[in-house]
From Swiss-Prot:
Protein name: Protein CDV3 homolog
Signal peptide: none
Annotated source species: Gallus gallus (Chicken)
Keyword Acetylation: yes
Places the protein is found: Cytoplasm
Classification lineage: Eukaryota, Metazoa, Chordata, Craniata, Vertebrata
Biased composition regions of type Low complexity, renumbered to the chain: 27-58
Amino acid sequence: MAETEERSLDDFFAKRDKKKRKEKSGRSAAAASTASSASSAASSAAGAAAAAGGPRPTDGGGSGAAASSSGSAKSKEEDDWKEFEQKEEIDYSGLRVQSMQISEKEDDESEKREEPSDNWEETSGAVDRSSGPWNKSAPAPAPVVETIVTEPPEPVQTGGVYRPPGAREGGRPRRAQQGPPEIYSDTQFPSLQSTAKLVDSRKY
């Protein structure tokens, strides 16, 4: 039983590896078509170098072929990066954006303000605070007429003993203490039976 499970797992992974190889070969075929133009340029450059410097001795015949293929791969990668480095200028004249150029002097000042100094406690007052919305002068507020509200004076405590607000004299009148609830009262505890009696009395 264990052998069949191992075989099925091996088959599964073998199929998966074949799919990966096919995908890689498909990618390499697409890359090869783009690399063919790059390799022709690289081979012409290599031919010119060989003519200028003469043939180079190699350790083995296969190593020279491997070096040329790796050189073409490097030149292909460099060509790819060169394509991304080239940027086209974009025309922003159609946009309704104001000119956003900063003079070098303002840029230097902002860099000085952003750089933290070692003795920040000493120079915290020396930071340029002249620019910003907080320095704009606001119109003077209208003078506010202060209305004097006279509060009734609180009664003076004699005796120096604290009394909570509920126990003080002159407070709210106390509610009469309520006794225990009347459980059998229909007004305090209405029941469905009493409502049924009420409905029956309405019918007649």
